[in-house]
Amino acid sequence: MSSGVQGGPAANANAYQTHPLRDAASALGTLSPQAYVDVVSAAQRNFLERMSQLASEQCDAQPAAHDARLDDKPALRAPQERDAPPLGASDTGSRASGAAKLTELLGVLMSVISASSLDELKQRSDIWNQMSKAAQDNLSRLSDAFHRATDEAKAAADAAEQAAAAAKQAGADAKAADAAVDAAQKRYDDAVKQGLPDDRLQSLKAALEQARQQAGDAHGRADALQADATKKLDAASALATQARACEQQVDDAVNQATQQYGASASLRTPQSPRLSGAAELTAVLGKLQELISSGNVKELESKQKLFTEMQAKREAELQKKSDEYQAQVKKAEEMQKTMGCIGKIVGWVITAVSFAAAAFTGGASLALAAVGLALAVGDEISRATTGVSFMDKLMQPVMDAILKPLMEMISSLITKALVACGVDQQKAELAGAILGAVVTGVALVAAAFVGASAVKAVASKVIDAMAGQLTKLMDSAIGKMLVQLIEKFSEKSGLQALGSRTATAMTRMRRAIGVEAKEDGMLLANRFEKAGTVMNVGNQVSQAAGGIVVGVERAKAMGLLADVKEAMYDIKLLGDLLKQAVDAFAEHNRVLAQLMQQMSDAGEMQTSTGKLILRNARAV
């Protein structure tokens, strides 16, 4: 009793109440599933270790000094007498029965725990598989979309290449058609120069028109095919961009799956053909760059050819206009020479009329005719020897003293009137100068036919001015030389004798035609004077008409010169356009080269990153 009292409550307690796993077993209901699995696993491990230890002791047939227990505690039994039979067999059975029950209990507990863990693991595995399958389906869908985009980009690139080849062939056909047009044009021009019949010219012209029509159709087809090639090239570029976007989506999905499912996700899912796809996309982009570069080269060649042909045509037109300009200038010069010759002929006729009138007026008309003849001969000699016409110098004071002030006064009045009406100052001055010259000429003609007194006044001024200039001219070296030349010419040619003989002949002719009285001679002289006046007016009119014709021809020549300058400007403009096309071609190539360089750098960086990751993985 004393021992029981001394032991207290611990001595009377059940062995299971003091078991080391009691607290752990009582806490099973409050633990988390993971801690629950850890506790049961630890208990199972301890149980199996102890069972293996007991089994090894029994197999070694070692006598048990005391009752072996699983918890290493001695078995308590009631005291008995010394002579009483041992109760080893029954105790052994009870011990065996307790160990078996504990083993059974732990086995059932382990089976329950294992079943629960397996169910949870299965559920997690199902969830994992479903998530993995969803990610795999998403990756498969993106991969299929990427492959479709790559195939479409490749097909579009092939179509663009075929369209570019067709456009090139059409360009060659258009070039051949242009050559045929040039040949037909040359045949037609040669036929026109050779003066072939009209039916032959019509057939050649029809062939030329047909060749032009075929060339136009060929250029239309070439332009259409070039536009189609450009359109397909743009479509290929868009599809290549779409394929690049699909590849980026695949890369993003793979990176997201790797971050979500861990580094082992790549081991559980099949490897995506990303590298081959990237390489294929790079090949497609390279082919696309080749097509774009080829298209730029062809475009530059076509523009260069077009500009060259346009320059050649403009140069041909320029040469033609230049020839026409030279012809118009030559025609104007010939017209001026012709009108000058006509004026000289009429002047000599007027001189002859003056000589004819001398037969009926006596010495005065003859002297006047001789003076006119001397002045005409002297003017021609002076023009031939010195290149200067003294008659022009004699008429210069008339222009400066009479005609020029009159023209300036009329021009000033007309200019002021136009400015008062609101016309621009510069345009008014130009119109006033033109109208002033016209009005002055009209006024002189009207005065010549109507106002005899005014004509006499003007004539007196003209005679005074001419007399003064003639005096100065005779006093100068040119005048003295002219007098000497006239004297020598008179001596050598017998002009004096010719004059006397002419006077005698005129007297005889006057007697032969029956002009004896002075009045009859004056009447004929007046008639001859009227005829000379009419011829002089006709000469002036013909000279004015010739001047107008020459002015028209010169205006045509100036128009041709303007066309020549315009053609030269067009040629310069074509050169500038060709230079701009070359600059645009260089810029396109630079952008494409920069794009491919960036792609190459990105691929190189990706390869370097892969090598670094592989090297680190091997090191681990």
From Swiss-Prot:
Compositionally biased intervals (Basic and acidic residues): 66-84
Coiled coil ranges: 309-339
Annotated GO CC locations: extracellular region; host cell membrane; membrane
Annotated transmembrane regions: 355-375, 401-421, 430-450
Localization, UniProt: Secreted; Host membrane
A Pfam family that the UniProt record links to this protein: SseC
Segments for region (Disordered): 58-95
UniProt cross-references to Gene3D superfamilies, sorted A to Z: Nucleotidyltransferases domain 2
Domain of life assignment: Bacteria
Keyword Secreted: yes
Keywords: Coiled coil, Host membrane, Membrane, Secreted, Transmembrane, Transmembrane helix, Virulence
Homology family: Belongs to the SctE/SipB/YopB family.
Known role: Plays a role in the bacterium-induced formation of multinucleated giant cell (MNGC), which is formed after host cell fusion, as well as in the intercellular spreading of bacteria and in the induction of apoptosis in macrophages. May act in concert with other effector proteins to induce fusion of host cell membranes.
Protein name in the entry: Translocator protein BipB
Organism, as annotated: Burkholderia pseudomallei (strain 1106a)
Species classification: Bacteria, Pseudomonadati, Pseudomonadota, Betaproteobacteria, Burkholderiales
